[in-house]
């Protein structure tokens, strides 16, 4: 068994408090820690501020404070080729992708992991709110973070056993408030820095405007299922299933209830809308999914198994039955109770209690075996 001082851990440092505390804790525990800042997008935010420069300066400050070397590595090409082109293709096809999941799978835990191994790392570490349990035989289990409100296993659900065996999550057992407290007590420069939001690496900006720079918007009609035109949309890519905001339709019609997106018709470039949060056309009983990835071999589960699932981040778990197709490349997921606004392109993530089993990308939603006109 190596002494901790001989175990090199390369920490992905974003300039935020979570990765700062991750690096600090590992250093305190005696590991050989190296900080690496990933540069994956070359741009300014909507305020004209180059946040990449600011973030790297924060990494430099924290690394100096805790006494570790730090570097910046450019993964712009990998991000564009492996994540952003997929992101754009999904939007072109009327779907709503989750770039953070693909970003973790292809950049943070693949391109970055490969780089870390090239500089003799034993592990990489990230500031994610997730936990790992390691069996005696070396197998790794991905567990929810201790902070229910911050748990990020949803975004890590496409990671493989091989990837996770080389990973540490130093703050996964902590509450966010504890992470802030540790940062403040250690005097870290990022202790009071606000959490980042927005698309992985791209940051906070007007999303429709940003998307329009790469995909020209094609306006069309907003129509009810009865064929009544209610107005015009600004391009199907700007809307997602269950969306209310931005439709610009008053509460007219049969009731005074607000209007929601209930589907998209790509052939006619039509946005389908309906009234009421609990509109029956927003509820599905099942879905099918592909691009499956499981953390560990689940062949002993047979052709079907029961577990819980999430269909979007921070959503309450729903009981489901998962049925594999013949070659186990796709699954049918049947819900214990109807679920609102199942969205093609998003991820269905499977759980067994606290353990994240893996996930698949949602292709279609169904109500009583009838395909819902979501795309």
Curated annotation (Swiss-Prot):
Disulfide bonds join 103-200. ATP binds at residues 12-19, 38, 127. It is an enzyme of class 2 (transferase). It is found in: Cytoplasm. CDD domains: MnmA_TRMU-like. The active site is at 103 (nucleophile), 200 (cysteine persulfide intermediate). Keywords: ATP-binding, Cytoplasm, Disulfide bond, Nucleotide-binding, RNA-binding, Transferase, tRNA processing, tRNA-binding. GO terms for cellular component: cytoplasm. Catalyzes the 2-thiolation of uridine at the wobble position (U34) of tRNA, leading to the formation of s(2)U34. Belongs to the MnmA/TRMU family. This is tRNA-specific 2-thiouridylase MnmA. It comes from Ligilactobacillus salivarius (strain UCC118). The lineage of its organism: Bacteria, Bacillati, Bacillota, Bacilli, Lactobacillales.
